[in-house]
Amino acid sequence: MFATTLQGFTLGLAMIIPIGAQNAFVLSRGIHRNHHLLAATLCCLCDLILIGIGVFGGANLLAASPIGLALLTWGGVLFLCWFGIRSLRSAWQGQGAALADSPRLMGVKSVLAMTLGVTLLNPHVYLDTLMLLGSFGSQFAEPLRPAFAAGAMLASLVWFYSLAFGAAALSPWLARGRVQQAIDTIVGLIMLGLALQLASGALLAS
């Protein structure tokens, strides 16, 4: 049982740790101590639900709906392009931008909307949780699947809260003007790169 949980935890971390839209957004909220725990909590909740659905048979739902997957993919492309351009604009404005005009600080509703956007409009999230974790988890006997799912869910909790708390703890250094400009630039390029990757994959598959 413990070995199965450890497998779920290890595979879950392997899926979550590579930089992506969720990680970049939680990191940016942590740097500004701007509802970072809210963002981390919502990312975790979405992951817990999707991991549970995937491990207990939901992987077939995504595979059986190519039209839905295509709509999700292109919606994700548009969202990631918007997010990337927004981050690059913030980097370009730099320290001279007025705080009121800066996209770096957000209200609760904006953080909720953005977190749901980088999660539910991100096809990689579904591929990781529903397809990969779901397919791997389905190989276990039914009595062991809850242990595997628990391990993967624990990985999500540990990672997102560590990222949020770590970014907040290092915010005095990370929030410096030039450092923040560099982070905004990197995040923007990552978002545009993910959008390009999604778009090219969708075009090749069509």
From Swiss-Prot:
It holds the Pfam family LysE. Keywords: Amino-acid transport, Cell membrane, Membrane, Transmembrane, Transmembrane helix, Transport. It is found in: Cell membrane. One of its GO terms (cellular component) is plasma membrane. Coiled coil: none annotated. InterPro entries: LeuE-type, Lys/arg_exporter. It is a multi-pass membrane protein. GO terms for molecular function: amino acid transmembrane transporter activity. It comes from the Bacteria. The chain crosses the membrane at residues 1-21, 37-57, 65-85, 116-136, 148-168, 185-205. Belongs to the LysE/ArgO transporter (TC 2.A.75) family. PANTHER family: ARGININE EXPORTER PROTEIN ARGO (PTHR30086), ARGININE EXPORTER PROTEIN ARGO-RELATED (PTHR30086:SF20). This is Putative amino-acid transporter YggA. It comes from Aeromonas salmonicida. The gene is yggA.
